[in-house]
Amino acid sequence: SQINLTLRNNKYEHELKNDTEIVRLICRLLIKNLPIAYLESFIRNKKRALSFFPKNPKFILTSMGYFSNELFKIWIAEQSLLNKKFCISVHGGHHSNSLFNHPGMFTEIISDTFFSWGWTKNILSSSKLSELKKNKNDYKYNKNETKICFVVYSGNKYSGSISAAPTSTNFLESLDIQKKFFCNINKKLLDNTTIRLREVSKTWELKTFYKNLGINKFSYLETEGLKKLVSKNSLFIFSYESTLFFELLTLNIPSILLNEERFWRLNKSGMADYNNLREVNILYDSFYKLSDFVNNNNLDSINKWWLNDNTQRIKNSFLEKNARSNENYINEWINTIKKNINK
């Protein structure tokens, strides 16, 4: 559908005439900025949704359809009117530890049952992490040379939600911390560093930012798979608690989180988790200390640190609470579905 300016300019105008100027302005801006899916295309989308999705679902579970699929949103609203139960599984990383997370709160509020990966009453092991755990011997990381993969937060330039994550000028400040880290590591390590990012990061021109720091290797989520990425690198450093961080911890691949709390604010539970990770050097909140670690450790000492009993214990405990996996997850899922069948 095309934008219907006549519809948007005139709709509800007569109902606003007695409101204050600020209310009229907000309502006009709202109408003019509503996505086409919610106005011009809504009737057509509703018809498509009701013809595409099941008419009498016995079980409804999603981890992303509620925010990424406009047809699903319409369909699930119709199912809610019929009193169908709607289950949501956590979408990804940092949900459990964030001080405030509007998308996460929205997820928990709209679902009849919310499943976490370990920190709530209702728990459902991640199918993706479980599959990785079952097949972890297929993922071999580089044990011949120290090669760093730095995984960056590729948020949109203009945030569409409110959460304890760096946005706008705060995001630029977080880049300055990364700049200081890369300026403090030796040239050989810098030459052996690959930046992992998403295509959406083009809005920030991140590739140019890292190139100006002397980094010339890049890996995109959309074009390079996990197995190939793992095979090229020996140490992964994350600028945020991403789902990929959980995946590599599950695969037991050396991984470090560089996190300053002023950019990624934590709740009390998250603070406790991060303190434990900090004790065994899986987490750093200082780029100076992290640069010292990578400069003063070779591949052998990195592997020795990673395989240390205490490091492994803390890592496994963190996963059990925040990113649970289960090699027998299929039976776990079957039992969960049986308990939540729509009658």
Region annotations inferred by a language model:
Residues 122-128, 143, 166, 211, ...:
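Catalytic binding pocket for nucleotide-activated donors in carbohydrate/polymer assembly enzymes
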Residues 121, 194-251, 256, 261-262:
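Donor nucleotide-activated moiety binding/catalytic core segment of transferases
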Residues 319-343:
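C-terminal alpha-helical cap of glycosyltransferases
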Residues 127-211:
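Conserved catalytic-core segment of nucleotide-activated headgroup transferases in glycan assembly
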Residues 69-71, 96-98, 121-125, 158-159, ...:
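Short, charged/polar "capping" segments at the starts of alpha-helices
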Residues 42-46, 70-74, 166-185, 327-334:
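Well-ordered, non-membrane alpha-helical segments in soluble/globular domains
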Residues 1-134, 244-245:
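Active-site and donor-binding regions of nucleotide-sugar-utilizing enzymes
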Residues 72-79, 103-104, 204-215, 268-274:
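Short, aromatic/basic amphipathic alpha-helical patches
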